[in-house]
Regions:
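Glycine-rich phosphate/adenosyl-contacting loop at the front of the ribokinase-like
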Residues: 1-72
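Active-site metal-binding loops of divalent metal-dependent hydrolases
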Residues: 11, 169, 264
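Conserved phosphate-binding/catalytic region of the ribokinase-like
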Residues: 3, 208-309
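Structural alpha-helical scaffold elements that stabilize or flank donor/cofactor-binding regions
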Residues: 125-126, 188-189, 220
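Short, conserved phosphate/pyrophosphate- and ester-handling motifs at nucleotide-, phospho-/glycolipid
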Residues: 37, 199, 262
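Conserved beta-alpha-beta core of the PfkB/ribokinase-like small-molecule kinase fold
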Residues: 132, 138-217, 235
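Conserved N-terminal subdomain of the carbohydrate kinase-like
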Residues: 15, 46-137, 309
Length: 309
């Protein structure tokens, strides 16, 4: 399995409140997915490369972030560095039920300037060499209007060149001026998407839909090759070639932190789909990895806690 995956998005410094104080790390939805993809590939010793595309500063914290990603096996060749910008930061507070509250400092983060400062033709030349392009709703939400148009045009060209486009909407209301703008943007990217890895709660919050069937009906109109609609601890609905199949999870009784549950699911899904071409096996792999991640604190669990898929 010789494949190249490009992951586009934002990574931030992560501060985690623990019983003993504060712990510093890094996280961001797409970076989490990139790390877990790289780990799975390395553990199986397969020829699958994962490159992260974003922007950071030229400060020592940005240096530390890049070194950490490299240690995880993520290619950082195309991470842009801007001397006048810094990475964003977020703080996680965990609740007793395993859910969490986030507090962000990201308005002037370097990643917000990446598309604006880079030439689309240059990015296309680089990215068209990849088999699969992965991005999320947050990748879109942090762009200004002009950059958003540039990014969507870039994805359109990459799709036309034969790249597989994978999208996770990961809707975060606070990042969008209005729900209507998020809807318009998501509809544009879904029209270019091959594999949609979405979350039912996010979709229903954005579209005010009452039932899963309402959401499925809307999404299937995009003609997606694969649609996965995740429902947290219950399982997910997988739709391929118009056929719906529910894939349940195995109950996890020691959940401590749901950070990166969806991101890790996506990584395992993509990895297993690339190796097996079986969407159901891919969803089961997603459940396995996500089920392990939520038993640990933080977005990125310890290497020795990784399951075998």
């Amino acid at each position: 399995m010789k494949k190249k995956i490009a992951v586009l998005g934002e990574c931030m410094l992560e501060i985690q409140k623990t019983q003993s104080g504060l712990r510093q790390g890094f996280g961001g939805d797409t970076l989490n997915t990139a790390v877990y993809l790289a780990r799975l590939a390395r553990a199986a010793n397969v020829d699958l490369s994962v490159s992260y595309f974003t922007a950071l500063g030229k400060d020592h914290l940005s240096d530390d972030m890049i070194k950490s990603w490299q240690q995880e096996g993520v290619d950082t060749t195309y991470v842009a560095r801007y001397a006048d910008k810094l990475p964003g930061l977020y703080l996680i507070e965990n609740r007793e039920d395993g859910e969490r509250d986030f507090h962000y400092w990201r308005q002037d983060a370097a990643a917000r300037y990446w598309i604006a400062r880079e030439e689309n033709d240059h990015l296309y030349t680089i990215l068209s060499d990849y088999d699969l392009i992965y991005l999320s709703g947050i990748t879109l939400a942090i762009q200004d209007n002009a950059s958003l148009i540039k990014l969507l045009n870039l994805i359109k060209k990459l799709k036309e060149s034969g790249c597989v486009v994978v999208f996770d909407s990961n809707y975060r209301e606070r990042l969008w001026p209005t729900p209507a703008q998020a809807q318009e943007c998501y509809e544009q990217i879904l029209a270019l998407t091959d594999i949609a890895l979405l979350t039912l709660d996010d979709e229903q919050k954005l579209y005010q839909e009452k039932t899963q069937n309402d959401t499925l009906t809307r999404l299937q109109a995009f003609g997606l090759a694969q649609l996965v609609l995740k429902s947290g601890s219950d399982g997910c609905m997988v739709v391929t070639k118009g056929k719906e199949q529910w894939v349940p999870t195995t109950a996890i009784h020691d959940v401590v932190d749901t950070t990166a549950a969806g991101d890790s699911f996506n990584a395992a899904y993509i990895y297993k789909w690339l190796s097996s071409q079986d969407a159901i096996q891919a969803a089961l792999a997603g459940h396995t990895l996500a089920g392990q991640v939520i038993r640990h604190y933080g977005a990125i669990i310890a290497q020795d806690a990784m399951p075998t898929l």
